[in-house]
Amino acid sequence: MDPTRRMFSMAAIAAAALASGAGAMAQSPAPIKVGVILPLSGGAGPQGQHVTEAIQAMAALINEAGGVLGRPIEVLVRDDESTPAVGVSRANELIGQGVAVIIEGWNSPVALAMQPVIARAGVLDITTFASADAVLSGEGNPLAIRLNASNSQGGAAVAQAIATGFKGRRIAFLTENDAYGIGTQQAIEAGLKALNHDYQKVAEEKFPFTQSDFRIALTSIRAANPDVTVAINANEGLGMPAILRQFKQGRVPGQLLAALGTVAPSVISVAGEAANGVAGVDIYFPDVEPFASDPVNKRFVARSQAMFKRTPDKFMAVGAAALQFWAMAANELKTLEREPLARRIRGGSFKGTVFGDVSFAPNGQLQLPTHAFTVSNGAIVVQKPAGR
C-alpha cells in the first residue's frame, strides 16, 4: 500500500474509533454529582447512615426512570461528625468536586454554619432536618429550602398534644442547649400561650447535644412532680434512647412527650421496652394512611427494603424526598442552575412524591400535617392529626 493510501486508511480507522467512542459516551453520559452531608458517626451516626441509604434508594429509582436531564445521579456522601467546622470543611470538599446540589442538615448549628458557604458557591442547598427557625431566615442562604417541620411547626404540634391530648398543667422541659433545643422549647411555650392553655413550668433542665447521662436532671424533674415532661433531643442514636431508659428507671411521674421527629423505630430499637408509653408527633409513617397505599411511597419502601433490608422511617423518607424534589424540578425546568430550581421549589407544588401531593411555603418550608402517636409493645401507634 502506498503511503498516501496508508495515511487515509489510518485516518479512517481513527475516525471510526472516534465515532465508536462518541457513541459510547452518548450511551453513558457523565453522572450528575449529588452531595450529602450528614452525621455518619457519633450519637446520630446510625440515623445519618439510614438517611444516606434512603437517598441512594431514591437515586436508583430516579436513574431507572432516566435520571436527571438524561444523566445518572452519583451520590457523594460525607460525615459532618455533628460539628459545625467539620460540616463546613465537608461542604467545601463537595463544592470542589463539582456537585450540583447538597443535601444536608441534621443538626441546626451545623446546617447554619454550612449555609453561607454553600450559597456563596452558587450550589443549591436543601436542608433536611435542622429545624431552627434561623435556617429559613435568609441570612445564611436567601434561597433556603427545608423539609422537616420548623421549630414553630413542631412546637405548635407538641403544644396541641399537651393541651388537648394530655391536658397537662405542670410541665417540665428537658432541653438540648443549642439553637434547635432552645428554639423548640420557645415554640412549644408560644404554642401553649396561643391555645390559651393555663400551665406552669415546674422544671427546666438543659444539656449539650453529646450528653447521655440525664439521671441528675431527671431527679430534679421527678421532684417537681410534672404532668408532662417534654424531651427535646436531636441525638436520636444516643441521647434520646438514654432519656427513655432513664425516665422509666427514675420513676418520673407523668407523661414523657418527645419533640417532633425525635422518636423513630431506630430509637425504639435502642431503648427497648423503656420506649413503651412515650408519646410524640411526626410527619411520616410508612405503613399508615395516606402513605401506606400511595404508589410512589410503596415503590420507595420496596426499593429501600430490597437494597438495604430496612423499612424507611421518617428520617429516611425526608432524605429521599429531598433528592426527589430536586430531580423533579431539574427535569421540569431542564436546568441544574441553583436560582431557578430554588424558585421552583420555594412556594411550589409537587405531585407524586414520597409524601404524596405537597406544597412548599414561599420561604422554602415544606408543608406537611403532623400526627400524634404513642409507642406500645415496641411499635409506633398513630392516633390522629395533631395540626398542620
Spans of features found by a protein language model:
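N-terminal secretory signal peptides and thylakoid transit peptides that target proteins
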Residues: 1-15
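Extracytoplasmic "Venus flytrap"
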Residues: 31-54, 78-85, 106-107, 174-183, ...
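Beta-alpha junction/loop-to-helix N-cap segments that form part of ligand/metal-binding clefts
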Residues: 46-53, 61, 68-138, 207-214, ...
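Periplasmic-binding protein-like
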Residues: 94-106, 126-128, 172-175, 225-236, ...
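Segments of small-molecule ligand-sensing domains
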Residues: 303-317, 325-380
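Extracellular/periplasmic periplasmic-binding protein-like sensory domains
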Residues: 244-320, 379-387
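Extracellular/periplasmic Venus flytrap/periplasmic-binding protein
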Residues: 88-89, 133-134, 142-251, 289-299, ...
